[in-house]
Amino acid sequence: MSATKFVKPASVHSRILVPGRYHRQPVISRLVSRYDLTVNIKAASLTLDSESDGWFDLELSGNPQKLTNSLSYLQGLGVNLVQLAIANQIQATDNSLAFPDSAYKLSPKDSAWLTDRWQEQFQQWMSLGQTNRLRLQLCVLKTYYEQPVISKLVSRYGLTVNITSAILQPDSQDDGWFDLDLWGRTKQLYSSLSYLEKLGLPIWLDLSSVYGDR
């Protein structure tokens, strides 16, 4: 009987440019669910304007073959792999395409709607007949810069996560702000919010979608 061969996980650092037409598709979420990767977002710049490209610096880790397949998937979508580093060795790069220093900033809601209010909002969301889609704004504190917070929403709770807008400067200069569209069962959504609360990350539920975009 042969022993199962252990495959050492690999790590890839990639800067990607996502075309505007894919802003409403959970591209990064699929890297986790489809290829079983851990994805840490190291920097992000994405606006709600579908005409603008989205920029992400990603740290991808997982099975080497699945990593290769995931990069092929991105290229198949027309995602530009601006910079790619494997084991800290630059494989392909275009230094003329530096990460944008965007003046765009998300507007956090009033501090009264911090993490201690999400359960009340969640109950309101359920009372209006919502069961599988939830929008929220998430602040990823700079102390969590090295942790794949959004990736775990997919791998641990089985959610589909679409990032609709984001701003996270490189090198943990500031907190990161993300507008997220979460899809999943009610229990999964509730558990994921509890997880974010335990981390101490500020979250605001966006109930406007309940009324205006069912």
For the regions a protein language model found, what residue spans apply to each?
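Long, contiguous binding/interaction regions
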Residues: 2-177, 181-214
